[in-house]
Amino acid sequence: MKIATLSIGDELIFGEVVDTNAAHISERLYSVGFKVQRQLTVGDNEQDIVEAIEMLAVKCDVVVVTGGLGPTVDDITARSAAKITGHELVLNEEALARLQRFSEKLGGNLHPSNEKQALMPANATLIPNPVGTACGFYLTHNGRFLFFLPGVPGEMACMLDETVIPFIVSRVKRRTFLQTKVFKVFGPSEAEVDALMDGVADEAAGVSVAFCVNFPEIQVKLRVEGHEEAVVAELLTRAGDKARQRLNGYVFAEDGETIDTVVASLFRETGFTLSLAESCTGGLVAKRITDIPGSSAYFLEGIVTYSNTAKTQLLDVPQRLLDEKGAVSSEVAVAMALGARKLSGSDIALAVTGIAGPDGGTAEKPVGTVYMALAGSNGCQAKRYTFHGDREEIRLITSFMAMDWLRKRLLSLRSAEVTD
């Protein structure tokens, strides 16, 4: 079954609002075995709406339309649907009754303009809206199923799950099962990842590979589809094992995990504690740590020492080092990490200092130069990196690299404990 989505609204065309509805519909349909073939967006123009629906209905069996069912003058989707089918707009008594009950529930009377939301083509079937005023409807046109839902994301999602998806599923005689596995990779380029994954896809068996760059990570997505759920699951497991082997060392998370949740899990598992000393990242690493609920169990302290004075007063960084080596140096990064660990009493301390730009770079230390240091019971190690991008990108990849270093250190410490 071929499915298309049509999103309606000038606010979408003008870039004032991001269209999350199309993405949600595609994701939900994919989860039950259907792939959206086409997505289209048009503004609040009757001719554009009519032409878009007619075009999509030629290519697809189902068209899910969102937006334009409100009470204002620019809400013209129902009128456009009536024009397509050649039926008049009529007042749907059930929709009107629902509107009245909803208004009374909110302690008011139904505004006359809201009655417009009860108008729909005479051949339409009502789709109830349990959480809002805009009822949807569906109808058939030249053998195609056309669904019309409100543009409010929460209302649309509820009606999609309660009416649209069950309807579509009931019309399919032989279901297709779709399963996905995601590997999140950090380090190699997209071209390098593509080369590593060569041979994993198997078109004949229904196994495909896709790549998505979500700076600074690369997501490798395995997709398997077939008519036997057990076979699909087995194929995905095999492909996943092969991909994991090919990407060995570069995978930091899988599926719904993130670098932040993985690091959090490792801290909880190992029982180690952490402190941070940040300069160029301005607390961004600490934010990533504390974004995860329960981080207070292992995160003791985070200090942003942006100025040299703060570095000396709060972290006991020797003024001599700052004068001789500069604030952006491996020596100062080490001193910051050791100072943070001493101050907090943590098992591990990580420090970051660098030049995020756009100014401040030199020939020896250009913009993007970052030093990190990681201190623990066995001493302190420092690393130098040279990142590229604008200020925001440099700060982002620096924080990501810091989290990845913590991940690798915790994995190493966990492995050492197991060996002991």
Swiss-Prot record:
CDD domains per record: cinA
Record-annotated disulphide pairs: none
Residue ranges the record marks as coiled coil: none
Record-linked InterPro entries: CinA, CinA-like_C, CinA_C, CinA_KH, Competence-induced_CinA, MoaB/Mog-like_dom_sf, MoaB/Mog_dom
PANTHER family listed in its UniProt record: NICOTINAMIDE-NUCLEOTIDE AMIDOHYDROLASE PNCC, NMN AMIDOHYDROLASE-LIKE PROTEIN YFAY
HAMAP family registered for this protein in UniProt: CinA_B
Similarity comment: family membership: Belongs to the CinA family.
The protein's name: CinA-like protein
